[in-house]
Amino acid sequence: MIRSVQVEDAAQIRDLCHQALGYDSSLEKVATQIEKFNMPDSGHFCFVYEEDQSGKILGYVEAEVYESLYSDPGLNVLGLAVFPSAQGRGIGRQLMERVEELAKSRHSTFIRLNSASHRKEAHVFYERIGYDGNKTQKRFLKIMD
């Protein structure tokens, strides 16, 4: 079942981010972010795939409203993760379909996402579900003290 993320999901989301994406974060950080994202008009959306039998979260997708001066409104997928042991079962596809439903309901004209250049399997997945890898970019980051 796909549903909106809840603060009670924070520990499972933290573990999922670590195992599927290699990101480490504290339980407090994940819980705080979920609380912020679930506030009205936050512009963030996060859905989880919860296994019916066990209640275990097997995947999640996170998106935000993307608006700029030069484009129509869209959605930006910030993260999609499925536990490695649950990959290949259609969970990622279902989560992305939920984002597509959201985009249609919000009259978004596109969905965009970035995927690290070394994540070749992810690229194949996105292309298989209809996304076009049409741009190569270099990301610049400045850590603020």
Region annotations inferred by a language model:
Residues 79-82, 88-101, 128:
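Conserved acetyl-CoA-binding loop-helix of GNAT-fold acetyltransferases
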Residues 96, 103-115:
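Conserved GNAT acetyl-CoA-binding A-motif
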